[in-house]
Amino acid sequence: MAPTRDEQHWMYRNMVTSRRFEETIAKIYFEGKSPAFNMANGPIPGEMHLSDGQEPVAVGVCAHLTPEDVVTATHRPHHRAIAKGVDLDKMAAEIFGKATGLSGGRGGHMHLFDADVNFACSGIIAQGMGPAVGAALSRKMQGKPGVAVAFVGEGAVNQ
């Protein structure tokens, strides 16, 4: 079944929001960084893993999910988090290491967690597969509807 006009608008807005969010984060991240990528400098602590061009994948999958469905992701989580409905302000605060972030600024961009929208990610490659399977099994055992999705990259397929 083809998406409705409203669904198409949501998908487009979500892809544009994801791209702009990541472009902005990248610009800020690289301010103050040396050519040697001294990660201690600049307003965003730690590393930054971007995923330009992958917005349609996250949006295409998450467009078919319900709020109860679970999504896990890896170290390039921004598009998936936005598509699942993670609050942009809280996610940005987390990336900047602020106390108002999703995990009080302690997780950074690779360890976003938002129980309100059933989203989690980890910087460990392929780590999200186990929790996604556990979430799906939990739903099945409790007789609850829903699915779990684990986003992984090509490097995680053989792990």
Regions found by a protein language model. Give the residues of each.
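Cofactor-/ligand-binding subdomain signature composed of acidic, glycine-rich
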Residues: 1-46, 52, 67
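Cofactor-binding active-site loop characterized by glycine-rich and histidine/acidic residues
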Residues: 35-159
